């Protein structure tokens, strides 16, 4: 059966999905000669998985975001029989075009097909009339993009970036091993649970290299609805020429995401579309120090041997404004440093020639991630604000599902993306 032979039988009927059990050569001095580090955190126990398809079992608490081009609302909800907090994504299938329905089908079937702790899980999928309901674990920290907006507007520390990227790239490596290109690797598609588990979402953009039982070396399909993800897309994907693109396109997106996490801003974000495309396709190779690719700000990067060093040689000093966030444990100093290993990682990912970029497996062996071998999954928690584990006592559940009428205004930024 093709991966696109989804369980979405029609616009108004979806069969319930329930989870079922089921060393590369160094290319750079910073890519160590060892097998890829693998420390997958445990996935949810069977007793914790919510499989109910009865809509009355879910008490919607609050809308926490939207996605899928504003067609999907994302809610924090309580599974009343167990008291477990879950995420409920609700999409009106009648509002979806055929292309969007195919994207939904792809996300639903692939979430069921893939089983990896660093890939976002759908516990169950069902319909209520023409509304598609997707039940998944509640990720208490939301997305890395939301963390940037709320707590780290000037960018994250190198240690936090390492923890987040390591988990996300592990999920990406799993997809690549299964012959799939993600095509939408970015901070808003990286989710973090309350216990520090990092997962990769955004499967609706995914494309398979497998066709008729054979794995192709390149694909030529241009992703639908790509306008919002263009800053992260690779030059060869945007070029749309006879050479096509492959999994190395995702590695370029990892480099852009690393810059996004480090600066708090998306490279190319404020550029006119034509200017962005020209710079990616014809411009000279750039690095995290190339301020011309970032939105205008007061932040300035410069080389320095002073300041707090990360422990790996000479550091790069980033001047930012001092600010204190809501948690006493979080404080962004007036200067933060990035090691040569971090810049090596970014520059490797942003190579214009995709053949010069490392694979996801090789990237996990990069010296930037070397410390992850000695750190546990919960080592990320001291770097984050307190997790949102339960609704506030003053927060009242929204109206019963039968009384809700969903209208999604265009002026609200999505916190989570489908």
UniProtKB/Swiss-Prot annotation:
PROSITE patterns with a match to the protein in the record: PROTEIN_KINASE_DOM
Keyword Transmembrane included in the entry's annotation: no
Alphabetical list of InterPro entries matching this protein: Kinase-like_dom_sf, Prot_kinase_dom, STRAD_A/B-like
One MF annotation (Gene Ontology) recorded for this entry: protein serine/threonine kinase activator activity
Domain of life: Eukaryota
Assembly description: Component of a trimeric complex composed of STK11/LKB1, STRAD (STRADA or STRADB) and CAB39/MO25 (CAB39/MO25alpha or CAB39L/MO25beta): the complex tethers STK11/LKB1 in the cytoplasm and stimulates its catalytic activity. Interacts with BIRC4/XIAP. These two proteins are likely to coexist in a complex with TAK1, TRAF6, TAB1 and TAB2.
Chain's role: Pseudokinase which, in complex with CAB39/MO25 (CAB39/MO25alpha or CAB39L/MO25beta), binds to and activates STK11/LKB1. Adopts a closed conformation typical of active protein kinases and binds STK11/LKB1 as a pseudosubstrate, promoting conformational change of STK11/LKB1 in an active conformation.
Family listed: Belongs to the protein kinase superfamily. STE Ser/Thr protein kinase family. STE20 subfamily.
Listed name of the protein: STE20-related kinase adapter protein beta
Gene: Stradb
């Amino acid at each position: 059966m093709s991966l696109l032979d989804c369980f979405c039988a029609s616009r108004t009927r979806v069969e319930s999905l329930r989870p079922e059990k089921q060393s590369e050569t160094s290319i750079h001095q910073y890519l160590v000669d060892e097998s890829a580090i693998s420390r997958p955190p445990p996935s949810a126990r069977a007793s914790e998985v919510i499989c109910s398809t009865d809509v009355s079992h879910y008490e919607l608490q609050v809308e926490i975001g939207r996605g899928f081009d504003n067609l999907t609302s994302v809610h924090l909800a309580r599974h009343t029989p167990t008291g477990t907090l879950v995420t409920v994504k609700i999409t009106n299938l009648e509002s979806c075009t055929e292309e969007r329905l195919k994207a939904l089908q792809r996300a639903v079937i692939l979430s069921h097909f893939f089983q990896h702790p660093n890939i976002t899980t759908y516990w169950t999928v069902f319909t209520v009339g023409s509304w598609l309901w997707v039940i998944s674990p509640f990720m208490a920290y939301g997305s890395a993009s939301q963390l940037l907006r709320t707590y780290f507007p000037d960018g994250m520390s190198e240690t936090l970036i390492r923890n987040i990227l390591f988990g996300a790239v592990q999920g990406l490596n799993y997809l690549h091993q299964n012959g799939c290109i993600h095509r939408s690797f970015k901070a808003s598609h990286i989710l973090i649970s309350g216990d520090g588990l990092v997962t990769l979402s955004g499967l609706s953009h995914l494309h398979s290299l497998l066709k008729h039982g054979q794995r192709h070396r390149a694909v030529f399909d241009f992703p639908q609805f790509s306008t919002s993800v263009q800053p992260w897309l690779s030059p060869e994907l945007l070029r749309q020429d006879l050479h096509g693109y492959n999994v190395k396109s995702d590695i370029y997106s990892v480099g852009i995401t690393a810059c996004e996490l480090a600066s708090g801003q998306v490279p190319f974000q404020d550029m006119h579309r034509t200017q962005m495309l020209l710079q990616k396709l014809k411009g000279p190779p750039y690095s995290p120090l190339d301020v011309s690719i970032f939105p205008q700000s007061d932040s300035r990067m410069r080389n320095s041997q002073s300041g707090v060093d990360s422990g790996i040689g000479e550091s790069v000093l980033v001047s930012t404004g001092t600010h204190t966030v809501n948690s006493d444990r979080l404080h962004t100093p007036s200067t933060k440093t990035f090691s040569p290993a971090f810049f090596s990682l970014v520059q490797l990912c942003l190579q214009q020639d995709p053949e010069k970029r490392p694979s996801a497996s090789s990237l996990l062996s990069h010296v930037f991630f070397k410390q992850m071998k000695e750190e546990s999954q919960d080592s990320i928690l001291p770097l984050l604000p307190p997790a949102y584990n339960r609704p506030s006592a003053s927060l009242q559940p929204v109206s019963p599902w039968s009384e809700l009428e969903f209208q999604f205004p265009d002026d609200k930024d999505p916190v989570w993306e489908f």
